[in-house]
């Protein structure tokens, strides 16, 4: 080896004031950004295209810091010392978000338009009956985990999709058309009605009419599969006379037994008004110091609605040419449910003249000389309730005609129990408007609690009215039948799947039904009518109509001429007489 001089070594030294090998300034390795990493870093995804951007999360600053703060590429957990220094424009390059996200897109992410029914408070939603509202991007309780529903019958809402623009809208018609000579006196929304309260009176029995057959307890047993009993159409004479035409109430009014008079079906609608969705109307007649709560001939109050409170309730279709659609409209379902309730109460009793229970007086509406059909099992109990307040100068009493359908032996001994017999009906658990109901044939006895809870949600107003009627009549128990179509495509044949019994007070507690609120509504309406007529002549007849708005949670009070609806009743009577004459010929 040739010797090297000191001068050569000095000349080979670098000119900078550093020691060691030269440090390269380029942080690119074959055109790819490079950064040191730690073996202790948690492994993550190489790429995630399903995560939402920062601008989509509106859950607050805390969630933002948790999910997005200091999120870098793989190896970023070591220190900020190793952050990549961008040497050129990389605006199209996105760093990987390694936070845990769900790969399923849900309807709430896009803020979809959700149609909701009254009272169905979905998670993270507010809103009233039959309204459209925007659901924000994950603003609900817990965000997407409540909206990520894997069931098609979730009832928390749905996103409008293919051809939803062509689907019928829920714009309902009023139960009665407002005429030009009517004067609106007051409009009250349901929020104000829900705040009223009056201590619920117990009531006392004044008299009773009619008779009752004993309930057939074999219907309480679970039916054998594929051997359910068919619902029979029985011809029996049953009456539902309005208040002012009741001869017993007329007699009690002449004796000044009370100031206000009503029937349980009319009164229950008024007491449960905040739960109602469809339109209804009540006629109020004020004559002298007496107030009568009446109903029109063929009023909607007499019909039994189906899934009125469901989030996706049945709707009327403009073109009902299809049979399947026409039998599942609200009007068709109401007629079907009314038919079922009438016949179910008749079929579930044992018609025996030897064992029937007779009340103090015979049926006040039955005329054996004119009627050809046998009389149905029905008991009428006229009961008086004290609605007085401490500041009232005179007591305010109300007489209500209540009804019971059957009687049953007390299982523990004692007096017989009076029953209210009603029926819930299933039309098609898979059809639109079913409200996410379970299949009764397979779930009624294995998941009875879930079935009843769903019915409480979808038919809140109907069950509340029945429970109120049972409490007004001081009935000992309620029998709820579950009736389904033999074929979902036909509304003419039905089968009885089972019967469940409840005590009215306990059932009211399960439904969160407050009778004090109902009595408060009644007392408020009575006070309003009396205040309007305070300066009128005592003998003058004043008539009012209370109407529930078909599309808003509002009731309106109208002043109408005294002869309103009388011409309609006369025309209806003429048509009935003409039809009877034609049938006799």
UniProtKB/Swiss-Prot annotation:
Residues 110-130 have a biased composition (Gly residues). Residues 565-585 have a biased composition (Acidic residues). InterPro entries: eIF3d. Keywords: Cytoplasm, Initiation factor, Protein biosynthesis, RNA-binding. GO terms for molecular function: mRNA cap binding; translation initiation factor activity. It is found in: Cytoplasm. GO terms for cellular component: cytosol; eukaryotic 43S preinitiation complex; eukaryotic 48S preinitiation complex; eukaryotic translation initiation factor 3 complex; eukaryotic translation initiation factor 3 complex, eIF3e; eukaryotic translation initiation factor 3 complex, eIF3m. Residues 110-152, 560-585 are annotated as: Disordered. Disulfide bonds: none annotated. One of its GO terms (biological process) is translational initiation. It comes from the Eukaryota. Residues 300-314 are annotated as: RNA gate. Component of the eukaryotic translation initiation factor 3 (eIF-3) complex. The RNA gate region regulates mRNA cap recognition to prevent promiscuous mRNA-binding before assembly of eif3d into the full eukaryotic translation initiation factor 3 (eIF-3) complex. mRNA cap-binding component of the eukaryotic translation initiation factor 3 (eIF-3) complex, which is involved in protein synthesis of a specialized repertoire of mRNAs and, together with other initiation factors, stimulates binding of mRNA and methionyl-tRNAi to the 40S ribosome. The eIF-3 complex specifically targets and initiates translation of a subset of mRNAs involved in cell proliferation. In the eIF-3 complex, eif3d specifically recognizes and binds the 7-methylguanosine cap of a subset of mRNAs. Belongs to the eIF-3 subunit D family. This is Eukaryotic translation initiation factor 3 subunit D.
